[in-house]
């Protein structure tokens, strides 16, 4: 079996997944462009064990919808694919591949990490989505809530497989362990405090970092009554973005800026330093389709505090075992969770071990198994035939 798997751009996550998948099926990885429009990843070319192609290069001037359509027609026909695999249904690239696959009658597999509750849902838009999802022969979903949403959109349950959202667990586990063996040296190198909560996110509104800073201020005030000052943890916010000045100003306003560290965006090789030196991980998003940083933290052996609005929470967070969930709009609740896990006798190591045990079932192998099963199913089901209405909807969406 040969599957063409499409992403906008390949970062570390995609490479780890497709490397694993290439051990089960023949994988052709295709990216629209050579750099991400969302993440400041450096080009990720090392450790690629599957055939990979960049369709339109790194120059944004080369990227246009017309160029992409021409490229698909020119490049795809000779590849003899048994199935195409697209990342959702919300962007032009995925819709273009679905349209191309319909034209040449090749089964389509839809990868999805959307849930019924990650965004406000409107009946008309949901009806349109059902028409597009109906063009898929199988699906690879992130986890349980993502599967449930695909079923709502009309995908037969027996055609849906799990495991889409995976990171290279071994990379984080091994490198975080190395960092812990030389923690003092790494802390000095990265300018890190002795004990801290770690958050890793783009500095954008949905990541809810202003409330996290407010919660940290409440936590710190409460902790001063409970613990010795040496037992109070700092907060490290890893990432960057448009809200940086607002976050810095809020930290100053609340009188906690000296304990909040913002080292900026860090490339993949640096991440284990921050996970390996942390005591616990916190992810406070008000909405999040999945939350791959939670995978990274768990693979690194950290307890996790995760917003109940994150798509990964139902499958990855076992309450009171490897972490806790919270209402991301409730500052007092977030602060209470921070206070709980930073208690001097809290079993951090046991929670961290539980994290690694849980995430072991949600790594690249699960992605590979899910993609293999989805490809087999898509081939058995065969390519969908679009109604005139579905073709018109697809064309209209591509003209937006």
Language model segments and positions:
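A short, histidine- and acid-enriched strand-loop-helix "catalytic/donor-clamping" loop
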Residues: 92, 106-127, 135-138, 142
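Donor nucleotide-sugar binding/catalytic pocket of nucleotide-sugar-dependent glycosyltransferases
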Residues: 134-183, 192
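Conserved donor-binding/catalytic core segment of Leloir-type glycosyltransferases
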Residues: 191-207, 213-216
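Nucleotide-activated donor-binding/catalytic signature segment of Leloir-type glycosyltransferases, i.e.
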Residues: 245-266
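Short alpha-helical donor nucleotide-sugar binding micro-motif in glycosyltransferases
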Residues: 263-266, 273-278
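Aromatic "clamp/platform" in nucleotide-sugar-dependent glycosyltransferases that forms part
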Residues: 286
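Short hydrophobic beta-strand element within catalytic cores of glycosyltransferases
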Residues: 303-307
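Conserved acidic donor-binding segment of nucleotide-sugar-dependent glycosyltransferases
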Residues: 319-320, 324-331, 339-346
């Amino acid at each position: 079996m040969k599957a063409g798997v499409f992403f906008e751009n390949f970062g570390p996550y995609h490479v780890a997944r497709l490397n694993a998948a290439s051990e089960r099926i023949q994988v052709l990885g295709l990216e629209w462009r050579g750099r991400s429009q969302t993440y400041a990843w450096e080009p990720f070319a090392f450790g690629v064990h599957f055939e990979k192609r960049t369709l339109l290069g790194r120059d944004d001037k080369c990227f246009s919808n017309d160029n992409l359509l021409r490229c698909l027609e020119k490049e795809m026909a000779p590849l003899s694919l048994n199935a195409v695999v697209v990342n959702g249904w919300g962007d032009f690239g995925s819709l273009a591949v679905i349209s191309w696959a319909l034209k040449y009658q090749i089964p389509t597999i839809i990868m999805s990490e959307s849930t019924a509750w990650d965004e406000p849902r409107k009946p008309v838009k949901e009806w349109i989505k059902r028409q597009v999802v109906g063009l898929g022969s199988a699906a690879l979903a992130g986890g349980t809530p993502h599967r449930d949403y695909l079923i709502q959109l009309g995908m037969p349950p027996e055609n849906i497989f799990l495991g889409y959202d995976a990171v290279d667990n071994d990379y984080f586990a091994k490198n975080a362990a190395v960092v812990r063996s030389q923690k003092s040296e790494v802390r000095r190198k990265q300018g890190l405090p002795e004990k801290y909560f770690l958050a890793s996110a783009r500095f954008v509104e949905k990541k809810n970092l202003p409330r996290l800073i407010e919660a940290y201020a409440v936590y710190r005030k409460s902790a001063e009554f409970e613990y010795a000052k040496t037992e109070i943890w700092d907060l490290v916010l890893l990432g960057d973005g448009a809200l940086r000045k607002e976050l810095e100003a809020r930290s100053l306003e609340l009188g906690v800026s000296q304990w909040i560290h913002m080292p900026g965006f860090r490339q993949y090789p640096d991440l284990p330093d921050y996970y390996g030196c942390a005591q616990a991980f916190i992810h406070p998003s008000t909405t999040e389709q999945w939350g791959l940083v939670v995978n990274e933290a768990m693979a690194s052996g950290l307890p996790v505090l995760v917003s109940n609005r994150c798509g990964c929470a139902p499958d990855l967070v076992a309450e009171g075992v490897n972490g806790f969930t919270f209402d991301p709009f409730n500052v007092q609740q977030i602060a209470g969770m921070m206070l709980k896990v930073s208690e001097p006798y809290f079993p951090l190591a046991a929670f961290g071990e539980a994290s690694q045990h849980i995430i072991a079932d949600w790594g690249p192998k699960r992605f590979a198994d899910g993609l293999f099963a989805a490809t087999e199913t898509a081939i058995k089901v065969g390519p969908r035939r679009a109604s005139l209405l579905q073709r018109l909807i697809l064309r209209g969406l591509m003209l937006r």
